[in-house]
């Protein structure tokens, strides 16, 4: 009786199980099956005959191994594929069709290949967020990739042979212009409803934004002038050894910006006294931790403990002052105070238990699933405690209001307005508005403001966000409550934002040299003048008459600035001394050996420069020595966070060439900040498709004038019928004037976007150029791309393979394949069941026969090279 199908399948499975468990028998069967493969058989037999000791003759550095050889970064080896199901050199039998094979698989939609062939890479989508790049690519809807501009060579293929070269170039330029115009219009339609885009270009939103920015600038200017009048800048120098004084000045500026008074500035003195009253070794430790670029866990915890101690001291001072006030109120208040203290003790014990379990997870800004499950049962308790905290925090506010009435003679305690707590949200979708985040976070006590970064084109225009709270709140509890909240199907996933570690950072000490300082004064004054003009900061208010253009700027720090830009030389004295037989003039330095000079420091010039730099930093949020502008700093958690200053004096003498090189490089870095914001000229705007408001209104009226029949016309906006088109037109202008205004605003909206020379756009996609025949690259690198560690993952364009990690690729040059077939066929998807060829160097050249059961040869390949022969790249 014949076996059933089930029995046959079971036996087949048993056969493969035996092959996997009994490796020697499978190898012998494979040798019998491949009788013609003499090389493999001989190598395997030799391997059986040799003992472990004999292997040491080939490579004495080889480590003794008693387990099967592990290939690093490779999966466990499975059953090897046989001749009948493997076509490594035949593209027509591949298991998965590559882009060039004409199949349905597009370049960006292949299945994930974590251990695939070195030639088969997952094509990186240029606008994927980090979660999509770290997860499976099959789970993400990549959308339709944008069209790629044709190269001139590709464009010529679409032209008739009769077209001459001049006409072809002209047509190609027209094609490029049309392509860019279409790309821009598509981008406008795709993003015009998003808040970040409307706030930049919509006429209604632009006016509000400018007004807010002007108000913030004027507030910063008032703070700067107030600090200057109070003498904060008199003895302040922007040198790294004055870091503590610089931080104190920045904190004073922040307190003033937050609406603080002179009384609130006293808290800076109290902090200094507390630091000095602490252990004598503590300040040195804190300075060391500030200087280090990254803190270890132990150091971070120590700093947190110090901060907690300082907060505890402040709380004790507050409670002692409250006791003095409450003693005068009577015995009844004492009983209430006892009850309050008991409640606080209970609450603090609960909070300590809860903080114990969650501290480590919150430090990293993420919570594990096990913790979320274990703490999910405490949700009701947390709500009750949150209500208690709200009530208890409202009580002190009421008491503070009553204090001035009861005890007008007592002074208010200074507030630490320069310190905040904040949350960081890495991925905020472009369709989420700022108002939605504000309404979500307003529910928690101590909320102050929200800051959103500029959208990132390479990350699907996702933005980063910072939510700032008062220093008194429990930021980790708020972070926990916001963990699993979704806005418009987007998880906010907040994390606690740590305080800045090094607020004062230094650059090269060569900047102390007199010649460089004078050049910096010139550049800084130019920057101040440019930014003041751009923001109209010193311009008169709209109601007041304008000043004549000949009058100088009203900015007080630019007064008499030219006196310091002119270098004084004693040319007459030198001439007289030289002609009267004095010392001969010094020979000019030779070009080959430039003369070295000492760093010369001029305190007077440095004082003038520092006032300019502080004006730029506080008023315009521009860090001069870092050559960058900090955008939206008023909305960030730290309103004056980081500043770069001059480093220590260089120990060695400097050459004149070094000074000139520094000045040249620094001016190049400042050029983008000095350039006025560019906008397209009228001619360029017309070429790019600038719209005329009157023409667009005519188009709108025409499209809403429909003829139903003879002497019967319809206005679809209202559904009314008229005898002629002129009546419909009159009706639209009279009854639908708001629609006409909307059309005009839409035109202005588009034109504002078009005329911005720095308008956002998708990253430009350039097809990769295949390398020349003699171009050799290191193994594993794709030509036309930088090294893997130099390129962000999200910036890979469509249709271009991802560069593999060094050491993964085969030894031969693997050109990128933008279009058309490769010079040799790729291996099929998943060939080799783990693809060990790449690790043992078996993929050296196309069509090379594979040794199927070879695990790896410890011996180096012996090769013969004729030194007299011409260069050849085909050595093994």
Curated annotation (Swiss-Prot):
Residues 8-73, 297-347, 388-413 have a biased composition (Basic and acidic residues). The modification N-acetylglycine is found at residue 2. The keyword Translocase does not apply. GO terms for molecular function: DNA binding. There is a cross-link at residue 150 (Glycyl lysine isopeptide (Lys-Gly) (interchain with G-Cter in SUMO2)). Its main location: nucleus. Keywords: Acetylation, Activator, Cytoplasm, Isopeptide bond, Methylation, Nucleus, Phosphoprotein, RNA-mediated gene silencing, Transcription, Transcription regulation, Ubl conjugation. The modification Phosphothreonine is found at residues 544, 671. The modification Phosphoserine is found at residues 4, 67, 74, 136, 493, 570, 679. Pfam families: ARS2, SERRATE_Ars2_N. One of its GO terms (biological process) is neuronal stem cell population maintenance. The modification Omega-N-methylarginine is found at residues 833, 840, 850. Residues 370-387 have a biased composition (Acidic residues). The modification Phosphotyrosine is found at residue 8. It comes from the Eukaryota. InterPro entries: Nucleotide-bd_a/b_plait_sf, RBD_domain_sf, SE/Ars2, SERRATE/Ars2_C, SERRATE/Ars2_N. PANTHER family: ARSENITE-RESISTANCE PROTEIN 2, SERRATE RNA EFFECTOR MOLECULE HOMOLOG. Acts as a mediator between the cap-binding complex (CBC) and the primary microRNAs (miRNAs) processing machinery during cell proliferation. Contributes to the stability and delivery of capped primary miRNA transcripts to the primary miRNA processing complex containing DGCR8 and DROSHA, thereby playing a role in RNA-mediated gene silencing (RNAi) by miRNAs. Binds capped RNAs (m7GpppG-capped RNA); however interaction is probably mediated via its interaction with NCBP1/CBP80 component of the CBC complex. Involved in cell cycle progression at S phase. This is Serrate RNA effector molecule homolog. It comes from Bos taurus (Bovine).
